[in-house]
Amino acid sequence: MSLVGGFPHHPVVHHEGYPLRRRRCRRRRRHPLRPRGEPLLHGWLISSHPEMSPPDYSMALSYSPEYANGAPGMDHSHYGGVPPGSGPPGLGGPRPVKRRGTANRKERRRTQSINSAFAELRECIPNVPADTKLSKIKTLRLATSYIAYLMDLLPKDDQNGEAEAFKAEIKKTDVKEEKRKKELNEILKSTVSSSDKKTKGRTGWPQHVWALELKQ
């Protein structure tokens, strides 16, 4: 006798010669209209005892401890179904994680190559103190000034291209400002030595000095 409704339970015949997968296929063939996850007890009760009403069926399910409490053993895989999360990625399964380390690796290599190139350029500049940290802009400025110094030494033979004569000026200077100051000093010296007469225009400064200032 079965616990479900007091009806006799039909014996289940197990065929040991068939594998488990073939038995699951035969179960699915016997019940093609059974939805996934629904126990086989529903079809057995409806087909064997059509006089049972839905309330009696729900009461019969409550008598079974496996169906009432939701035992962990009663999952979809027990009835031939597929457990959630184990299917392919397009059917709700775990999606593969995309690796985005390629772009970061390329950027890291590019930064390392630039830093190594600037380090080699700093070693080529002479007369730089060892404890001085040069930025990239200062390194480029000193390199250009050293190249200009070497170009000036080409037509001369007095220093024979000695690198010790080059002075690395680390102070921040503006080339345009220095050039403007030199031009003003030369103009002032020429005007004072040539004549002492007063010129028309603004007093205190020569007229061409003011013209030069206005052009800036």
Swiss-Prot record:
Which regions are flagged for Gly residues bias?
82-93
Give the GO cellular component terms, alphabetically.
nucleus
- Which Cys-Cys disulfides exist here? none
Q: Which Gene3D superfamilies match?
A: Helix-loop-helix DNA-binding domain
One MF term in GO for this entry? protein dimerization activity
Which SUPFAM superfamilies is this protein grouped with? HLH, helix-loop-helix DNA-binding domain
- Listed Basic residues bias regions: 96-111
Q: What is this protein called?
A: Heart- and neural crest derivatives-expressed protein 2
High-level lineage: Eukaryota, Metazoa, Chordata, Craniata, Vertebrata
